[in-house]
C-alpha cells in the first residue's frame, strides 16, 4: 500500500528549486535540506562541508563533505579515488571488473600493443580520479584514442578556479608529479602520470545507490535513445547481494554509487552476473532527483538519520519528505569586504523567484562578519546557503556560514 504522502503528492519529473543547480552540488544541498528540516544548528564551510551540531546524545556533531557522511573513512574514499587499488580489491573479493591496465603517457608502444590485444571500443579514465564521480570516455578507434589522450594530458585550468572547489575531490591529494610546459605555453601532466584503459563492457547499465549497506535505489541508463538521464527500476533489493559484496571489498565507506553492467534487469542479480564498471563515494543524487524528487530527498534524509543519534529526528523523520518552511538566523564570517558581499548577495537574490525572504541584520567590518535571516522552504534556504558558501552565482564568498 502506498504511503499517504505518495497519494497526496503525484510523482512528476523534477522542475523545482534545484533544476538549474550544478549536479556536483546536489548531494550536499539535499543533505543540508535534510539537516534544516530537523532544525540542527549548522556550519557551512568551503568544499561544501556542512557540520550539524547536536544539543545532546553520545556525539556532539555530524559532518558531511559533498554529501558524503563523516562516518566514511579517509582511507576508504582514497581507495575509491585510486582505481588500481579499487579494481584489485574488487577482484580479490570475486567481483568481475572490465579487463584493464594503467599506463603512463610515455608508454605509447605498450598502450598500442595492449589495445590491439583486447580490441576496441575501450574506456579511458584517469588512474587517480581527479573529479568527483568522473566516468571516463569511450573510444572506438586509434584516431579517437589519440585525440582523447592528447586532451586528457592537458592540465585543465578550470581545476584551479573557484567553481572547481565543488567539482574536485576534496578528501586527499593523491598525486603531486610536476607538470611540464610546451613551447606553445600549454601546461601538460607529467609523462609519468598514469591513465587507465579498460575494455568497454556492452549490456544494460544499472546504477545502484547504497546507503549503509542497503540498496535504496536502482536506476537504468538507456543507450542509443538520445536520452541522457536515468530511469528508476522497481525492486532495487534484487541487487542487494552485489552491493553487499562491493561494501565488503571496499571497507570504510558508508555511501556508494555503483555502476554495473548486466544482461537483463528483470530478475535477481548476483555478483557473478554483473560487471562492476565504476564505484564512487558520491551518490549522484541529481540522477535520482529528476525522475523522483521525493525519492532523492528520502535518501538524503535516510543518510542523515543514519548519522544522527538524536531523538528529535526520530520523531520528525516520517514528515521529512514534505517541503517545510524555516526561519534561520545566519552569520557569514571571514569576509574581506562586507559591502561587496552584500552587494553580490543582493544581486543574486534579485534573480530568485522562489518565495525566499532575505533580511539583513548587523554587520561588523572589523571582524568581517554579516548577520542575515532567511525565511522560506527548506529547499530554497538550502539552495541559497550552498550558493553563497560554494560561490555558485556569487563571486565573494565567506570563510564560513553559521546557521542558528
Regions found by a protein language model. Name each.
Residues 132-134, 202:
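Domain-scale recognition of functional cores that engage charged ligands
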Residues 41, 205-207, 259:
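Short, surface-exposed charged micro-motifs
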Residues 3-119, 129-132, 376-404:
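Conserved N-proximal alpha/beta basic substrate-recognition cap immediately N-terminal to
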Residues 122, 216-217, 275-278:
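Protein kinase-like catalytic core scaffold
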Residues 104, 128, 199-201, 262-264, ...:
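Short, flexible loop/turn elements at secondary-structure junctions
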Residues 150-229, 234-238, 246:
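Phosphate-binding site of ATP-dependent enzymes
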Amino acid at each position: 500500500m502506498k504511503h499517504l504522502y505518495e497519494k497526496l503528492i503525484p510523482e512528476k519529473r523534477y522542475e523545482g528549486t534545484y533544476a538549474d543547480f550544478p549536479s556536483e552540488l546536489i548531494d550536499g544541498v539535499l543533505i543540508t535540506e535534510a539537516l534544516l528540516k530537523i532544525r540542527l544548528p549548522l556550519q557551512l564551510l568551503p568544499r561544501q562541508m556542512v557540520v550539524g551540531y547536536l544539543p545532546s546524545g553520545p556525539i556532539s556533531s555530524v559532518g558531511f563533505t559533498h554529501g558524503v557522511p563523516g562516518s566514511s573513512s579517509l582511507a576508504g574514499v582514497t581507495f575509491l579515488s585510486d582505481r588500481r587499488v579499487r579494481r584489485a580489491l574488487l577482484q580479490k573479493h570475486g567481483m568481475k571488473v572490465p579487463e584493464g591496465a594503467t599506463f603512463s603517457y610515455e608508454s605509447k608502444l605498450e598502450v598500442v600493443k595492449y589495445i590491439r590485444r583486447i580490441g576496441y571500443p575501450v574506456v579511458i579514465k584517469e588512474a587517480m580520479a581527479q573529479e568527483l564521480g568522473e566516468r571516463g570516455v569511450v573510444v572506438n578507434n586509434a584516431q579517437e584514442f589519440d585525440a582523447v589522450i592528447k586532451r586528457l594530458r592537458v592540465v585543465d585550468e578550470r581545476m584551479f578556479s573557484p567553481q572547481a572547489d565543488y567539482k574536485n575531490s576534496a578528501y586527499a591529494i593523491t598525486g603531486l608529479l610536476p607538470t611540464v610546459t610546451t613551447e606553445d605555453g600549454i601546461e601538460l601532466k607529467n609523462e609519468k602520470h598514469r591513465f587507465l584503459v579498460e575494455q568497454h563492457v556492452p549490456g544494460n547499465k544499472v546504477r545502484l545507490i547504497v546507503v549503509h549497506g542497503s540498496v535504496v535505489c536502482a536506476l537504468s541508463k538507456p543507450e542509443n535513445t538520445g536520452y541522457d538521464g536515468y530511469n528508476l527500476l522497481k525492486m532495487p533489493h534484487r541487487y542487494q547481494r552485489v552491493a553487499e559484496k562491493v561494501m565488503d571489498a571496499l571497507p570504510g565507506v558508508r555511501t556508494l554509487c555503483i555502476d554495473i553492467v548486466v544482461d537483463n534487469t528483470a530478475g535477481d542479480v548476483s555478483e557473478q552476473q554483473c560487471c562492476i564498471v565504476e564505484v564512487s563515494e558520491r551518490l549522484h543524487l541529481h540522477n535520482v532527483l529528476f525522475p523522483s524528487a521525493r525519492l532523492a530527498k528520502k535518501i538524503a534524509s535516510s543518510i542523515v538519520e543514519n548519522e544522527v543519534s538524536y531523538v528529535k529526528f526520530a520523531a520528525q523523520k516520517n514528515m521529512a519528505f514534505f517541503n517545510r518552511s524555516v526561519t534561520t538566523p545566519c552569520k557569514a564570517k571571514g569576509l574581506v569586504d562586507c559591502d561587496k558581499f552584500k552587494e553580490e548577495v543582493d544581486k543574486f537574490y534579485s534573480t530568485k523567484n522562489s518565495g525566499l525572504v532575505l533580511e539583513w541584520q548587523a554587520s561588523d567590518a572589523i571582524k568581517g562578519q554579516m548577520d542575515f535571516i532567511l525565511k522560506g522552504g527548506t529547499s530554497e534556504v538550502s539552495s541559497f546557503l550552498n550558493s553563497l558558501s560554494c560561490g555558485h552565482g556569487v563571486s565573494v564568498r565567506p570563510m564560513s556560514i553559521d546557521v542558528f
